[in-house]
Amino acid sequence: LDGGDFSMGTLIQTVYETEAAELRMLGYLGCDVTTWGNHEFDYRSSGLANMLNTAKASGENVPSLVVCNVDWSAMEKAGLTEGQQQIKDAFENYGVKDYVVVQKGDVKIAVFGVFGKDSLDCAPTCELLFEDPIEASKKTVEEIKKNEDVDMIACVSHSGTVEDEDKSEDEILAKNVPDIDLIISGHTHTQLDE
């Protein structure tokens, strides 16, 4: 599982759109599921859309991409911008979902993704609108519990943790959605002692 920001930080990012090298490498490494982070928007909506389409067209094993709090309803009501439409089409082509179920041995795990508020603040080129991460997570967990027979519910989150518990988005998520068994927390690079 991966918590996002898979696309930046090395020279390989120069082929982000044309080769989808980072996403394809996650597949080579055996990563089953990822979500996106703020850096996936560094090449704007068209860059993210091109990367997803390139990864899909490669025919290679790539991880599932999950994010449950994109607010397509609000964007469609206002009329999708060109960038929003590009990402929506790429999502459909790639098969992006709110959650997926993976089987590891005898264990079935539902994995959903969420994009945090601070992540959005760090992605000024992101054209998408998002539902509140906590509320979207609650809805998704309820949907999983209703429709899936799983042993565990995991969240790949690009929200993060910080020392101030009142601002630590993934700690707040854990407290407000107690049916999540595991949160893979990306974004903040914070070391936690417990």
Region roles according to the model:
Residues 1-194:
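Acidic, metal/ion-coordinating pockets
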